[in-house]
C-alpha cells in the first residue's frame, strides 16, 4: 500500500496540478498581458469542466458505492473530493490575486473595470439611464414564495441574488438572471476609458428592481451542473440514435448542481438556504473576488488589438517543404510518405488532398472518422462535394464527443442529406481515432492514400494545437485502415492487426509487448529506451509495466502535458523515469511513442493517450512510421521538447512540478519549431 501511494498520484489531483501550470502562465509577467488574460480564462473554463465532469462523476460514485476505491491510490470518492476542495480554494486565491494585478496593469493601457464606488455622479446618472433603457426591460426578476417556487438556475449562468425584507420584517429571496445575449456584458462609460460588467450594474440596482423591499444582502452567484451522463447506458434501441442524443443534451442541462460560486461573502444562513434549494452540500460553495465568468476578457483584447506588444507575436502556419502545392497532392504522397506538423505547418496540403479526392474521377471512395469539427468546415464541404459527385463517402461522426454533440448532430444531418453514409459511433465505445482512407482505381489498378493523425479534422484548432498528420500510400497500412472502417460499419471493433495499433483490442497489449522488449534488452546489458509524448497517463497496466522497465534499467523519458498518475524518480522504483510537461502558447496535443535505441527505433504517432478510457473504452489508432526521414524528424522533435527549459516543468519524486534547473541557453520548444517552419518555408520560396 505505501509503495503504491508513493509511486502513483490520484488522477484528479494530478489534473489540478496541470491547471495550476495553466494558472502559472497567467501569473508569468514575461507573457504579454492580453495573453495572460487568456490563460486566466482558460484556467477558469478548465475548472468549470472539471467540476461538471470529474467532480460530478465522483458525486455519482458516492451515491452508488461510497466505499469504492480508485485503483492507483486507493482513495474513495469522498477522500478524493475532500482533497480536491482545499486545493481548488488555494488555486482560486491565486487566481484572485493575479486577476487584480492584471486589472491594475490594464489601467496603464486606458482600460478601467469599475464599480459604482469608483465613478462620478455624472457617470452614475448615465448608467442609471442606461440601465432603465437597455437592461431593465429585458430582465425577469423572481421573488421566491408560495406561488413562485425556486427557479431552475442554468448551468454556468450568472444570477443576482438578494435577501429582501418586507415591511413586517419577513425575509424573502429575490433572484434575477443576469445573462442576456441582447445586451452587452461589457458596458463602456462614454467619455472615459472605463467599463462595467452588466451583472454588477444589475446587482447595484437590485433595490430599484425589488421596490417595496429592504435589501438586506446581495451577491452574484453562478451554478455549475453535473454533466457526467452515460449515453450508452440510457440508450433505447427503439429510438433513432441522433434524436436520442438531442434529448440527452437537453437532459444534461438539467442535471444536479455540483458547485456554487459567490461574488460576495454572505451570511451563513443565506448560503444554507440557497444550498437547500439547490440540494447542494455547503462544501461545494466557493467565494471568489474575480468575476464569475472571465470570457469578457476577449472583448478587452478586441479593444486593445492594435497594441501589439500586449499579444504574442503573430504567427502564421507555414508552407511545408515536403509539398509542392501547385502539383496534385495525392500524386506526391504516392511517391513518398508525408508528415505535417501543426500549427507550425499549414493544414492546406491535407485540405487540398480532400478537395482533389472530391473532384478526381479515379477516386471511388472516401472513408473518414470525425470527432470534433470546425463550425465552418472546408473538410465537410469537400466530403459533401465528393458525395454529390457520385463517390462512395462513408463518415463516422462521433455524436458522443463531449460538448461537441450539437455541432456533430448538425454536420451528420448535412452529410446525410448530401448522400454520405453516416455512422453514429459504436455501442460502448467512443470513436476517437483520426483516420481517413481514400481509394482510387485507375486503369483497373487500385491504390490508396491513408491519413492518420493525432488531432481532430478541425481547421481552427490546427492553428492552436500541436498535432501531427501522416499521409501515406503504404498498402499494408491502407488495408488495415480498411479493416477498421469495415468493422465500424458493422458496429464492431478490430481484433488483430500487424501494423496499426488499434484500441480497444490491440493497442494496450502491443504497447506492453514493446515495453517488454526493452526490458529484455536492458537485462541483456544492452541500451534500452522508451520515449512517450502525450496528454495524459493513467492506464495502470501500462504504468506498472513502465515501473518494471525502470527497475530493469530502461531509460524512460515522458513529455506529458496533463494528468500523470506515475510519479518519477522514486528510489528503487521509478529512478529511470523522467516526466516533463509543456504548457505554452499552443495546446500540446500530439502523441508520439518511441521504443528502442538508435538503429532499432519503433516510432508511432497516435490519437491515443495512455489513459484507461483510450486504451480500453475507445477506438483509437496509432500508426508506425516507416519512412526513415520522418522517423528521425519525430525523434528530433521529441529531443527538443525534452530540452525545453522555458515552458517545460519537470516533475519531481514528490509529484511536484518545477522549472528545470539546467543553465543551458533558454529554449522554448514551440517557438523553436515555429522558427524552423519559417526557415523551411523561406528556403522553399527562395
Give residue spans per PLM region.
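Hydrophobic alpha/beta core scaffold segments
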Residues: 555-559
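N-terminal localization/anchoring segments of enzymes in phospholipid and broader phosphate metabolism
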Residues: 1-530, 548, 552, 564-686
Amino acid at each position: 500500500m505505501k509503495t503504491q501511494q508513493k509511486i502513483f498520484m490520484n488522477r484528479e489531483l494530478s489534473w489540478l496540478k496541470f491547471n495550476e501550470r495553466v494558472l502559472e502562465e497567467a501569473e508569468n509577467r514575461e507573457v504579454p498581458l492580453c495573453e495572460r488574460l487568456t490563460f486566466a480564462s482558460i484556467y477558469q473554463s478548465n475548472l468549470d469542466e472539471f467540476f461538471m465532469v470529474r467532480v460530478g462523476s465522483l458525486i455519482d460514485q458516492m451515491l452508488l458505492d461510497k466505499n469504492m476505491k480508485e485503483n492507483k491510490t486507493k482513495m474513495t470518492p469522498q477522500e478524493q473530493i475532500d482533497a480536491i476542495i482545499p486545493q481548488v480554494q488555494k488555486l482560486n486565491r491565486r487566481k484572485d490575486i493575479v486577476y487584480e494585478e492584471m486589472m491594475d496593469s490594464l489601467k496603464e493601457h486606458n482600460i478601467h473595470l469599475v464599480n459604482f464606488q469608483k465613478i462620478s455622479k455624472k457617470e452614475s446618472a448615465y448608467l442609471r439611464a442606461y440601465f432603465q433603457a437597455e437592461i431593465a426591460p429585458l430582465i425577469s426578476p423572481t421573488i421566491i414564495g408560495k406561488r413562485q417556487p425556486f427557479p431552475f438556475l442554468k448551468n454556468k449562468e450568472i444570477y443576482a441574488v438578494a435577501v429582501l425584507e418586507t415591511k413586517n420584517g419577513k425575509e424573502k429571496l429575490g433572484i434575477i438572471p443576469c445573462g442576456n445575449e441582447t445586451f452587452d456584458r461589457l458596458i463602456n462609460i462614454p467619455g472615459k476609458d472605463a467599463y462595467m460588467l452588466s451583472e454588477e450594474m444589475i446587482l447595484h440596482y437590485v433595490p430599484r428592481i425589488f421596490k417595496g423591499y429592504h435589501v438586506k444582502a446581495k451577491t452574484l452567484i453562478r451554478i455549475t451542473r453535473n454533466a457526467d451522463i452515460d449515453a450508452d447506458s440510457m440508450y433505447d434501441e427503439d429510438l433513432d440514435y441522433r434524436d436520442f442524443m438531442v434529448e440527452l443534451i437537453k437532459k444534461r442541462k438539467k442535471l444536479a448542481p455540483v458547485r456554487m460560486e459567490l461574488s460576495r461573502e454572505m451570511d451563513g444562513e443565506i448560503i444554507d438556504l440557497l444550498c437547500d434549494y439547490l440540494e447542494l452540500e455547503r462544501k461545494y460553495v466557493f467565494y471568489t473576488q474575480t468575476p464569475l465568468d472571465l470570457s469578457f476578457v476577449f472583448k478587452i483584447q478586441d479593444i486593445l488589438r492594435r497594441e501589439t506588444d500586449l499579444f504574442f507575436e503573430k504567427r502564421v502556419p507555414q508552407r511545408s517543404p515536403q509539398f509542392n502545392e501547385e502539383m496534385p497532392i495525392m500524386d506526391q504522397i504516392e511517391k513518398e510518405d508525408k508528415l505535417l506538423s501543426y500549427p507550425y505547418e499549414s493544414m492546406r496540403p491535407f485540405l487540398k488532398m480532400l478537395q482533389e479526392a472530391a473532384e478526381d474521377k479515379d477516386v471511388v471512395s472516401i472513408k473518414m472518422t470525425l470527432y470534433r469539427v470546425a463550425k465552418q468546415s472546408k473538410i465537410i464541404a469537400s466530403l459533401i462535394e465528393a458525395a454529390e459527385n457520385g463517390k462512395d463517402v462513408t463518415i463516422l461522426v462521433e455524436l458522443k464527443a463531449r460538448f461537441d454533440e450539437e455541432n456533430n448532430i448538425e454536420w451528420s444531418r448535412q452529410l446525410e442529406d448530401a448522400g454520405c453514409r453516416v455512422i453514429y459511433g459504436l455501442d460502448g465505445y467512443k470513436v476517437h481515432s483520426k483516420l481517413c482512407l481514400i481509394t482510387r482505381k485507375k486503369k483497373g489498378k487500385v491504390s490508396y492514400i491513408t491519413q492518420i493523425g493525432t488531432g481532430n479534422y478541425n481547421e481552427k484548432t490546427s492553428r492552436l494545437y500541436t498535432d501531427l498528420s501522416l499521409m501515406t500510400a503504404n498498402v499494408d497500412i491502407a488495408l488495415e485502415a480498411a479493416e477498421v472502417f469495415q468493422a465500424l460499419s458493422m458496429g464492431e471493433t478490430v481484433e488483430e492487426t500487424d501494423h496499426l495499433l488499434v484500441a480497444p483490442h490491440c493497442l494496450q497489449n502491443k504497447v506492453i509487448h514493446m515495453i517488454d522488449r526493452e526490458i529484455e534488452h536492458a537485462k541483456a546489458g544492452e541500451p534500452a529506451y522508451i520515449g512517450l509524448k502525450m496528454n495524459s497517463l493513467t492506464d495502470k497496466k501500462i504504468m506498472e509495466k513502465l515501473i518494471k522497465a525502470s527497475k530493469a534499467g530502461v531509460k524512460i523519458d515522458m513529455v506529458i502535458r496533463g494528468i500523470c498518475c506515475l510519479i518519477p524518480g522514486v528510489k528503487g522504483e521509478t529512478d529511470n523515469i523522467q516526466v516533463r510537461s509543456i504548457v505554452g502558447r499552443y495546446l500540446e496535443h500530439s502523441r508520439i511513442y518511441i521504443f528502442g535505441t538508435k538503429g532499432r527505433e519503433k516510432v508511432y504517432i497516435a490519437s491515443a493517450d495512455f489513459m484507461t478510457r483510450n486504451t480500453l473504452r475507445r477506438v483509437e489508432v496509432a500508426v508506425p512510421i516507416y519512412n526513415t526521414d520522418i522517423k528521425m524528424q519525430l525523434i528530433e522533435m521529441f529531443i527538443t521538447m525534452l530540452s525545453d527549459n522555458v515552458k517545460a516543468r519537470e516533475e519531481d519524486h514528490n509529484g511536484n512540478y518545477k522549472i528545470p534547473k539546467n543553465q543551458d541557453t533558454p529554449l522554448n520548444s514551440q517557438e523553436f519549431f515555429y522558427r524552423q517552419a519559417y526557415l523551411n518555408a523561406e528556403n522553399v520560396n527562395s
